[in-house]
């Protein structure tokens, strides 16, 4: 069982055991319960109210630490899967995981940049809260622009390290191996065969006497998919995302720089509130409170449109876009919905609508708790920029 896998992992480590090694062994032996423990702790950070000043920083710090811990758990689980001889028969990684895992293992620059941008993403809201509490609004906006500048620089470096392939929204492998699946992967081959025989009843053919596994009528398609290889399964990992052309690179740069441009426009708007009217921009539109929201949305929509045109040019040239290409473009398009929770649109339309829903929920017995939970998150959307950040 898992003890055998722990021994295999120990053989690969020549250094003396440390408390971290002991924790790794504990994690592998209790993989089934790790996910539930993480979920419970995250639920605590969700439920704790955000409207109390003494709690918001603590809860967001807890949430950030849990994300970092979860990322470390993913690394240990991936190492355990790689050390198991049964992994190939039970687990098939997704194209996203194959792609990101290859770059992390083969490109040190991508590895460190992806980790850095991930850690910055985990802690950005906490940093904004601390900056606002200690230095006021001006310090908060300087912190926001600094963080967005760091993330943009890291993503541009990652774009170059992939030789100008689209960046994955999540630059590291997702956790696809659950605790139960890890226990299955870690079992001996004999145990796996016995369990498979118990779970898959055999049907004996009357004429030849051969036996074949019975398949549930509703699961025929899923059964066949487990027996065949897709093109994504045999293609080289670094080819799972296509190379961008010149206009595709421009679209990717717009997507990377959009958060920084939007934050700078919001900062300029904040500064304009405290300066004389004579020093403001000569262009009336830039002085409008809607200017940052409109410009940011136009930049992001233009980037998505250009990425869609890149996929179309691939098809017209005879190249079939990969499944990961299409999934990434579709996922970015779905992120446009977050503009409902940003800037002047949120203040003018989304916020009043949500507060009216909260007021109605509080009048319905049994639903007041949900209204209070929504109100707690609206507190964060009202006061902090990174609450609605997606990159």
UniProtKB/Swiss-Prot annotation:
Localisation: Peroxisome membrane
Keyword list, A-Z: Membrane, Peroxisome
Entry's Gene Ontology cellular component terms: peroxisomal membrane
Short name of one Pfam family: Pex16
Predominant location category: membrane
One BP term from GO: peroxisome organization
Membrane topology: Peripheral membrane protein
Family per record: Belongs to the peroxin-16 family.
Protein name: Peroxisomal membrane protein PEX16
Organism for this UniProt entry: Yarrowia lipolytica (strain CLIB 122 / E 150)
Gene: PEX16
């Amino acid at each position: 069982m898992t003890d055998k896998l722990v021994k295999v992992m120990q053989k690969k480590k020549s250094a003396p055991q440390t408390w971290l090694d002991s924790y790794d062994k504990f994690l592998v032996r209790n993989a089934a319960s790790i996910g539930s423990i993480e979920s419970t702790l995250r639920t605590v950070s969700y439920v704790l109210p955000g409207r109390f000043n003494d709690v918001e920083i603590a809860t967001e710090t807890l949430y950030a630490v849990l994300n970092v811990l979860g990322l470390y758990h993913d690394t240990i689980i991936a190492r355990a899967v790689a050390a198991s001889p049964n992994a190939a028969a039970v687990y098939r990684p997704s194209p996203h995981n194959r792609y990101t895992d290859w770059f992390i293992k083969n490109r040190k620059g991508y590895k460190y940049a992806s980790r850095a941008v991930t850690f910055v993403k985990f802690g950005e809201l906490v940093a904004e809260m601390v900056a606002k509490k200690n230095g006021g609004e001006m310090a908060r906006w300087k912190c926001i622009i600094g963080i967005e500048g760091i993330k943009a620089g890291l993503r541009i470096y990652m774009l170059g390290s992939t030789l100008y392939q689209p960046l994955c929204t999540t630059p590291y492998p997702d956790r696809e191996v659950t605790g139960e699946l890890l226990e299955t992967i870690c079992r001996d081959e004999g145990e796996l065969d016995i369990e498979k025989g118990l779970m898959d009843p055999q049907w004996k053919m009357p004429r030849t006497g051969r036996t074949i596994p019975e398949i549930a009528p509703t699961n025929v398609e899923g059964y066949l998919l487990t027996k065949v290889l897709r093109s994504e399964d045999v293609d080289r990992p670094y080819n799972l995302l296509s190379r961008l052309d010149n206009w595709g690179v421009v679209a990717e740069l717009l997507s990377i720089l959009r958060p920084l441009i939007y934050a700078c426009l919001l900062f300029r708007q904040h500064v304009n509130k405290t300066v004389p009217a004579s020093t403001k921009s000569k262009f009336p539109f830039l002085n409008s409170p809607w200017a940052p929201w409109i410009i940011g949305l136009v930049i992001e929509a233009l980037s998505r449109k250009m990425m869609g045109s890149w996929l179309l040019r691939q098809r017209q040239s005879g190249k079939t876009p990969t499944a990961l290409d299409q999934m990434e473009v579709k996922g970015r398009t779905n992120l446009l919905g977050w503009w409902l929770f940003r800037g002047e649109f949120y203040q003018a339309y989304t916020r009043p609508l949500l507060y009216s829903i909260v007021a109605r929920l509080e009048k319905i017995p049994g639903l007041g708790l949900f209204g209070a939970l929504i109100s707690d998150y609206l507190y964060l959307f009202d006061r902090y920029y990174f609450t609605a950040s997606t990159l």
